[in-house]
From Swiss-Prot:
Disulfide bond annotation, renumbered to this chain: 12-62, 16-38, 24-43, 28-45
Domain LCN-type CS-alpha/beta: 2-63
Entry protein name: Beta-toxin Tf4a
SMART domains from the UniProt entry: Knot1 (SM00505)
Example GO BP: defense response
Tissue expression remark: Expressed by the venom gland.
Lineage summary: Eukaryota, Metazoa, Ecdysozoa, Arthropoda, Chelicerata
One protein family per Pfam: Toxin_3
Signal peptide (residue range): none
Gene3D superfamilies named among the record's database cross-references: Knottin, scorpion toxin-like
Modified residues (Cysteine amide): 62
Amino acid sequence: GKEGYPADSKGCKVTCFFTGVGYCDKECKLKKASSGYCAWPACYCYGLPDSASVWDSATNKCGKK
């Protein structure tokens, strides 16, 4: 698998700015990752499936129309 910042449907990082402990681990596991943590202010996942969308500065479309 791969690791990285999981991207939501808009291509944005999953924020953990105001979330509780364990939020990112749960979010990452929902995306079939093995684990995750809050790399403040965004979630970071380990063991993501290769098909998972991760945030990439080169292909960043967050906030763009």
